[in-house]
Swiss-Prot record:
Cysteines joined through disulfide linkages: 30-226, 72-82, 87-93, 139-215, 145-198, 153-163, 167-176, 177-185
Lineage of origin: Eukaryota, Viridiplantae, Streptophyta, Embryophyta, Tracheophyta
GO biological process: defense response; defense response to fungus; killing of cells of another organism
Protein's name in the database: Zeamatin
Pfam families: Thaumatin
Signal sequence annotation: 1-20
Length: 227
């Protein structure tokens, strides 16, 4: 009997976790093909214009990212390279992409049973993006970065036709909020450029107050490239 009770308890716990998993619908509305990437769950998939991809992430997933890769070529084994967002020369990503790339970031079922999510330009920008709750939870707010940041990118930040951030370009403490600037980091002229283009998005590592969004655990989400 004790064993049966334990099994039932485990089953109920698994159902509870599954009930708070999040489904991410990734949609490509760009007028070109992208190779969507998602870690630590999902891997990667080619998305032609108008195509979508559904990813289920379990409750408790942290340090997660979704992004678009562009200009990719892969062989039949899934090996190749991308002009932007490349993740080690493979279609199925297991690690983060190479800057510059626009990032959707999330952590599920964290403090106060909340999901935390954002769009980050700390690694630069390659395609416009929105990251919004996908109905049903009563949660409606999320970040949008729908402008073409590349169009007015400062010349010194331009790379491969897209726009890098100052941190990966100059690797200085004041741009990366590390070392001497770890506890006293402020916006710079470069981060202000990104913030002016996309007020909802992270423009530098300490940009939490205006760039972090929350929804109740169990919310589903939609990430749109070129909204």
């Amino acid at each position: 009997m004790a064993g049966s009770v334990a099994i039932v308890g485990i089953f109920v716990a698994l159902l509870a976790v599954a009930g708070e998993a999040a489904v991410f619908t990734v949609v490509n509305q760009c007028p070109f093909t992208v190779w969507a990437a998602s870690v630590p769950v999902g891997g990667g998939r080619q998305l032609n214009r108008g195509e979508s991809w559904r990813i289920t992430a379990p409750a408790g997933t942290t340090a997660a990212r979704i992004w678009a890769r562009t200009g990719c070529k892969f062989d039949a084994s899934g090996r190749g390279s991308c002009r932007t967002g490349d993740c080690g020369g493979v279609l199925q990503c297991t690690g983060y992409g190479r800057a510059p790339n626009t990032l959707a970031e999330y952590a599920l079922k964290q403090f106060n049973n909340l999901d935390f999510f954002d769009i980050s330009l700390i690694d630069g920008f390659n395609v416009p993006m929105s990251f919004l709750p996908d109905g049903g939870s009563g949660c409606s707010r999320g970040p949008r970065c729908a402008v073409d940041v590349n169009a007015r990118c400062p010349a010194e930040l331009r790379q491969d036709g897209v726009c890098n951030n100052a941190c990966p370009v100059f690797k200085k403490d004041e741009y990366c909020c590390v070392g001497s600037a770890a506890n006293d980091c402020h916006p710079t002229n470069y981060s202000r450029y990104f913030k002016g283009q996309c007020p909802d998005a992270y423009s530098y590592p300490k940009d939490d107050a205006t760039s972090t969004f929350t929804c109740p655990a169990g919310t589903n989400y939609k990430v749109v490239f070129c909204p």
